[in-house]
Regions:
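NAD(P)+-binding Rossmann beta1-loop-alpha1 motif at the extreme N-terminus of oxidoreductases
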Residues: 1-63, 88, 92-93, 102, ...
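Conserved short alpha-helix immediately C-terminal to the canonical SAM/SAH-binding motif I
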Residues: 36, 69, 99
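Alpha-helix C-terminal capping segments
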Residues: 37-42, 80, 103-107, 145
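CheY-like receiver
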Residues: 52-56, 73, 144
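Rossmann-fold dinucleotide-binding core
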Residues: 64, 94-145
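Glycine/threonine-rich flexible loop motifs
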Residues: 64-77
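Short, conserved loop/helix-junction motifs that constitute active-site signature segments
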Residues: 77-85
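A short helix->loop->beta-strand "cap" motif at the edges of active sites that frequently abuts
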Residues: 84-87, 108
Length: 145
């Protein structure tokens, strides 16, 4: 079974995680305020740290507030990338293009994949995903899209 982690279980991230679990992927979640992730305990593993969530994951999705939050989760105080640098990192947050390019240069496998469709699209698993990155990584990620 493919293991995925999703970091950021707010309005968009929580239903995205639930849909990944429903699709049969072993899903681990983390949120900066852990109580926001607890409602997903019925279908996902909830962890207390981002590093714990990403350990052993084949793919890591980030869905957080902005470029600064993604930077902090991935490289800053939460150190998620260091815990699993070989995973396919898929950022679905809306971040600045220059930041996405910087992440792409720092991470072995990275897809910049902002989404459109709002909470309704996340709940119904109908989000439009606009992805930039290598063709190989995109092909690997299609199973989760």
């Amino acid at each position: 079974m493919t293991k995925v982690a999703l970091l950021g279980t707010g309005i968009m991230g929580a239903p995205m995680a639930r849909n990944l679990a429903k699709a049969g992927f072993e899903t681990t979640v983390w949120n900066r305020s852990v109580e926001r992730a607890q409602p997903l305990a019925d279908c996902c593993t909830v962890t207390k740290t981002a590093a714990e969530a990403v350990t052993g994951a084949d793919a890591v999705f980030t869905m957080v507030e902005n470029s600064g939050a993604v930077l902090d989760v991935m490289f800053g105080s939460h150190g998620a990338v260091a815990a699993n640098p070989s995973a396919l990192w898929i950022d679905t947050s809306s971040i600045q293009p220059s930041v996405a390019r910087d992440f792409g240069a720092k991470i072995e496998r990275f897809l910049d994949s902002p989404v459109s469709g709002g909470e309704k699209g996340a709940i119904e698993a109908t989000l439009a995903i606009m992805t930039g990155g290598s063709e190989e990584d995109f092909a690997a990620a299609k199973q989760w899209f």
